[in-house]
């Protein structure tokens, strides 16, 4: 008995020793691998050029540069070449600009992980499709993707039409003939669409819900990440945690999450009362059904994904619509071609558009794509490489951080001659046929291609066509240029100003 206890104790001690040695060995290996990747990235960065950087801060202060997009990103290829060195604090990043190189990275499932600073958006977007990585991202993508099937998207057209009509009525009541920042009105319209399409709050039948949605935290959301980069010490969570900014962000997250949970409860009650068939099905309904058949998809996951769609969809689509309308204002010949196309599609009818009508808006789609080329809603994407990548001129080590900059790639003169000019014909079938598929990235590309891209294009077409059928868009003297600024999504500093004039022969009855 004594001998058996000694042997048992010895075996346990040996097992503990082995486990401790294993943990130490793995820690040493991880440290060595991380250090090796870091040193290789630093050595490569020293052979590349990029914008001037500051000691310790690197290029973080570029976030404060209101002229960053035009002065730096728009001319990146001419200034620095196809691979640009960027320092984020003491960490080297590589901005990849050429479509051939981008395809190597974006098309591979091995490079779908996001870099460390995406977690800074968790208190804003939650841990949803935009910010998550690994198995969580791939599982959620697989589960949610069917909700954006072509046949289901068609059911959202009535939502787009109702919101567009509401936008028209608001403009007709207070904006015709005056100078307006069209972005403000468009953003409200897009939020109306998302309220119904994502949360299930009908646009025309809100009743008591109107006040509730007017106070919606999704109208007031503010992302703190850019401010943390301008004060890089706040990138350290141990310091940031004690700031007023962090407290405000946590309170904002609580408001967003609590509000979304109320919406989930509301949709569950509607489903339980068998009233679901009387209302348009929304994304929350789909996600509730997913959670009922997949235990791993929890209510917290529904909240995170709903916040992602509400907040990301609001900024990106709102900007795309506003930029498109503004550019049509500055290019009246393109606006006239869009109006002629709409007259051909609708003839003398004042009916709302169908899915077929939206597909027939081919020239308008060219205009939308050209607006997205010039002003992509998300001008910067970051990825962490899962393995070594050989590009045309350089090799990037596994684990290194890369930037994909659609704003810069969309301005490569050897792909888009005279890149600052608005030319929708670039996207005609004959002109697009031989263009590299990764030369146009408004919705990213590859496995992480934006899940809502077709939803967004349909939404934009519906809003733009509704306004063009009733109004002529005119420029505002002294406000004919765009000062693009980068705040995660692309914004127009100072707004996008237009004048609306009632058409003598509107293409739709009022």
Curated annotation (Swiss-Prot):
The keyword Oxidoreductase applies. It comes from the Eukaryota. It comes from Drosophila melanogaster. GO terms for cellular component: endoplasmic reticulum membrane. May be involved in the metabolism of insect hormones and in the breakdown of synthetic insecticides. Its main location: endoplasmic reticulum. Signal peptide: none annotated. GO terms for molecular function: heme binding; iron ion binding; monooxygenase activity; oxidoreductase activity, acting on paired donors, with incorporation or reduction of molecular oxygen. PANTHER family: CYTOCHROME P450 4AA1-RELATED (PTHR24291:SF177), CYTOCHROME P450 FAMILY 4 (PTHR24291). It is found in: Endoplasmic reticulum membrane; Microsome membrane. Belongs to the cytochrome P450 family. Keywords: Endoplasmic reticulum, Heme, Iron, Membrane, Metal-binding, Microsome, Monooxygenase, Oxidoreductase. It is a peripheral membrane protein. Its EC number is 1.14.-.-. Transmembrane segments: none annotated. The keyword DNA damage does not apply. This is Probable cytochrome P450 4aa1.
């Amino acid at each position: 008995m004594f001998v058996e206890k000694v042997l048992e104790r010895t075996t346990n001690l040996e097992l503990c020793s082995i486990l401790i040695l294993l943990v130490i060995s793995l820690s040493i290996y991880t440290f060595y691998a991380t250090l090796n990747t870091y040193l290789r990235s630093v050595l490569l960065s020293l052979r590349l050029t990029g914008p001037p950087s500051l000691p310790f801060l690197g290029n973080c202060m570029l976030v404060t540069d209101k002229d960053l997009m035009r002065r730096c990103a728009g001319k990146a290829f001419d200034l620095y070449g196809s691979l640009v060195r960027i320092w984020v604090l003491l960490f080297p990043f590589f901005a990849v600009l050429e479509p051939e190189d981008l395809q190597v990275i974006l098309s591979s499932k091995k490079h779908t992980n996001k870099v460390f600073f995406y977690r800074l958006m968790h208190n804003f977007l939650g841990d949803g499709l935009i910010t998550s990585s690994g198995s969580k991202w791939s599982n959620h993508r697989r589960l949610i993707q069917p909700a954006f099937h072509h046949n289901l998207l068609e059911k959202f057209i009535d939502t787009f039409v109702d919101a567009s009509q509401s936008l028209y009525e608001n403009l007709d009541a207070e904006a015709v003939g005056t100078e307006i920042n069209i972005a403000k009105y468009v953003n409200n319209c897009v939020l109306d669409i998302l309220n119904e399409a994502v949360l299930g709050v009908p646009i025309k039948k809100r009743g008591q819900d109107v006040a509730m949605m007017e106070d919606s935290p999704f109208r007031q959301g503010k992302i703190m990440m850019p401010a943390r980069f301008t004060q890089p010490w706040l990138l350290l969570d141990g310091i940031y945690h004690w700031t007023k900014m962090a407290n405000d962000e946590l309170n904002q997250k609580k408001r967003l999450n609590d509000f979304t949970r109320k919406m989930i409860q509301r949709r569950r009650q509607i489903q339980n009362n068998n009233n679901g068939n009387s209302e348009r099905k929304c994304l929350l309904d789909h996600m509730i059904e997913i959670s009922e058949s997949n235990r791993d998809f929890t209510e917290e996951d529904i909240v995170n994904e709903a916040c992602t769609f509400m907040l990301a969809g609001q900024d990106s689509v709102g900007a795309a619509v506003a930029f498109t309308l503004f550019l049509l204002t500055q290019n009246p010949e393109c606006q006239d071609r869009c109006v002629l196309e709409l007259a051909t599609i609708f003839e003398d009818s004042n009916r709302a558009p169908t899915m077929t009508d939206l597909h027939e808006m081919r020239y308008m789609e060219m205009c939308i794509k050209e607006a997205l080329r010039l002003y992509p809603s998300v001008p910067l994407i970051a990825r962490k490489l899962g393995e070594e990548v050989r590009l045309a001129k350089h090799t990037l080590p596994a684990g290194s951080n890369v930037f994909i900059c659609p704003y810069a790639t969309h301005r490569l003169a050897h792909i888009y001659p005279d890149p600052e000019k608005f030319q929708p014909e670039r996207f005609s079938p004959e002109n697009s046929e031989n263009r590299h598929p990764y030369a146009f990235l408004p919705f990213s590309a590859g496995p992480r291609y934006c899940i809502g891209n077709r939803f967004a294009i349909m939404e934009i077409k519906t809003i733009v066509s509704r306004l063009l059928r009733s109004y002529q868009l005119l420029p505002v003297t002294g406000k004919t240029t765009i000062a693009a600024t980068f705040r995660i999504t692309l914004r127009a500093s100072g707004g996008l100003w237009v004048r609306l004039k009632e058409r003598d022969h509107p293409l739709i009855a009022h």
